[in-house]
Amino acid sequence: MSNKSKGNRAEQLVLDHLISKGMIGEIIETKMRLARGPRGAFLVPDVGEKLGDIFGLMEGKAVLVEVKAVESLTYSILKDHQHDNLRKWYQQGGVAVVAQVKSDGTMFIMPYPMMWIPGENITKYFKP
């Protein structure tokens, strides 16, 4: 299974779980738009900044989720812009979440920010 399909599967598992807990949400994907040119109309990707993998509402709060399909979740797995987006989301009063899905389907859903030490596996503090 490719990394992209593992990621898509992980995102769907997390979304389904959060919806079962009452969240109204969706997986954020690049949208296609219709563009017109001298030779007719055609579809092009509507490229915009993607804030995270899942966006939703839960208990009146905006939720942003970053999903990682990895066996060990360390600080460096998230890219700098992902840390920035999650931190800013949290600072503005939203709920920022990092979700880890292991290959066996075990899922960890953790609030962000965490007391993360770069290089440390944070899931040792959580039970599935």
Stretches with model-predicted labels:
Residues 18, 54-72:
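Conserved catalytic cores of phosphodiester-cleaving nucleases, focusing on short active-site segments
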Residues 87-115:
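Nucleic-acid nuclease catalytic cores
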Residues 71-91:
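Mg2+/Mn2+-dependent nuclease catalytic core
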Residues 47-51, 58-64, 91-93:
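Short connector loops at helix/strand junctions that flank enzyme active sites
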Residues 11, 50, 79-82:
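Amphipathic coiled-coil/heptad-repeat helices and related helical stalk/stem segments
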Residues 108-128:
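Intrinsically disordered, low-complexity terminal regions enriched in charged/polar residues
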Residues 1-45:
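Acidic-basic catalytic patches of nuclease active cores, encompassing PD-(D/E)XK
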